[in-house]
């Protein structure tokens, strides 16, 4: 494993282009690429077995679990739901410095459940940044990931279960135009070796993408319709690619940043995206409904740079009354009483700028420590 980065070839721009063309034929273009993040920071939420029954009742086929919550893992047995299984940031140091701890973690939380629980990815940490409040943890992300990967590989499961991490958009230094996307220079020493690992392991990078926060951070230059997928036409022309919504522009800036490292081709999974219905600037029921509905129906189309279906996870399953600040309490797609907050669904048609309501059909992720 120590030689994985040395074995990663630097791709020319032509090689990257040809590899993306080849990959288009490998990635399924289905409309069932949506997940929903389910958090547990509330004192009025249903137990895990009822929540998973709610997924099944709504034909929800994917989930993100941010830590190995044992009641949830047990309830997931034979459910057919694909899972992103998370490792909390608090466990990174132990797993990075002790291979036996990584093997024990895999035995306890993966082998004890797989394959009756359909674990698809293991997310080693969430939003760790070498320049943020979690900077002291950055040194542990890659070695923890390598140790978990080695434990998975020893069981012959490295092709079935991909080991990765989740980042946020603060690691992007330039995002405009999207084709010029690049990572911040002060995070390259952290990210480049990790990207090399992803190329070696054939694993995707998980990225949390929130047009909401980009809009409220710069409402003068980023309009609300652009953030909500409701712009009447192309807002950003970037060479041959036209951008009518902010989500595509943000995601393609990540694609470009990865490509522009020259390390190799990496797929991206959107591990969080959402819009709060209350508690802050530009928050309303209608804004949240429109964003979520449009995102659900949009991801099957992909982005201008990568025009195949995007795997994405909405945030969040429930409104969580123990989160802060106030807007963080209002990202839910369902109320804590298990009633739908929004009537959106797949396959709807927009009429005169309105969202046509449809049956909910998506994917859920469990979030218990964020």
Curated annotation (Swiss-Prot):
Residue positions of the active site = 127, 272
Q: Which GO terms describe its molecular function?
A: glucan endo-1,3-beta-D-glucosidase activity
| An annotated GO BP | carbohydrate metabolic process
Name the EC number(s).
3.2.1.39
Question: What is this enzyme's catalytic activity, as reactions?
Answer: Hydrolysis of (1->3)-beta-D-glucosidic linkages in (1->3)-beta-D-glucans
Which segments are removed on maturation as propeptide? 348-370
- Renumbered to this chain, the signal peptide range is 1-32
Pfam families to which the protein is assigned, alphabetical: Glyco_hydro_17
Key word Signal present: yes
**Which residues carry a glycan?**
361
Q: Which residues carry this modification: Pyrrolidone carboxylic acid?
A: 33
What does this gene product do?
Implicated in the defense of plants against pathogens.
The protein's name is Glucan endo-1,3-beta-glucosidase
Q: What is the protein's species of origin?
A: Pisum sativum
